[in-house]
Amino acid sequence: IGFDLAKYSEIDYAKDLTDKLNIKNISEKISKEEYMNALSEVYYHMDEPTADGCAIAVYFLSRLASKDVKVVLSGEGADEFFGGYNSYDDNFYTKLPFFIRKSMASICKILPKNKITRYIIRRGLPLEESYVSINRTYYDDELKDVLKIDNYIKNKDIVKDVYDEYKDYNKLDKMLAVDIRYWLSNNILTIVDKMTMAHSIESRVPFTDMKVFEVARMLPKNYKVSDGTTKVALRNAARKVIPNDAWKKKKLGFPVPI
């Protein structure tokens, strides 16, 4: 599944890869009109509000798959178990001492809010607050002003139990734990289950098998994220069976043009 905007579509790349592997490829591009028209049906099948636009992409992907199969295999869990998200990797700025990032954040709080200032503000927070705030729209002080109440649940309080449990673990393991406990189980798997069932097909997620998890949790940090490369162990395993440009490819994810 892809969209009209090239940066939101891997259809051409997928076609090239499947041709090299002699695998049948079926794809479909979704227009803006189709996307918007599907909103009400997607949220009907979700049974609850969701702010994740990829639910609609999975809806269309499931619709396409349902024309030929009744059961599909999906890759959910690989990123959370093996370190697949780019946010797991430290860049130049996040490697700066915390007191410098905190000072920069204080300055940016009084500047007009944009993508850059919000990034600097978030990186000036402790991990317990900064990581869970990656996709949020409002910071706590802004939310307090909008809601006009004081007793709302803060993001850091939602995930406090995970950080308390993993307080002696390294930074990467803490982020993985948060994503497994909340992002994977409460969002991703829910979306895949409901969107496939909306088209009367079933999804199987082999990466979430307990034996796979036990292997992943024993891997050292550099086998997950190292020098800008994510999912190191999986890439090394895949290099034996897929072309170099495939296992070296930077992760795009499943973005939607919203």
Feature locations, PLM:
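ATP-dependent adenylate-handling active sites, centered on carboxylate activation for C-N bond formation
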Residues: 1-155, 194-241
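Structural motif
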Residues: 49-51, 166-179, 229
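A short, charged helix-loop
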Residues: 152-165
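Globin-like tetrapyrrole-binding proteins
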Residues: 184
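PAPS-dependent sulfotransferase catalytic core
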Residues: 242-258
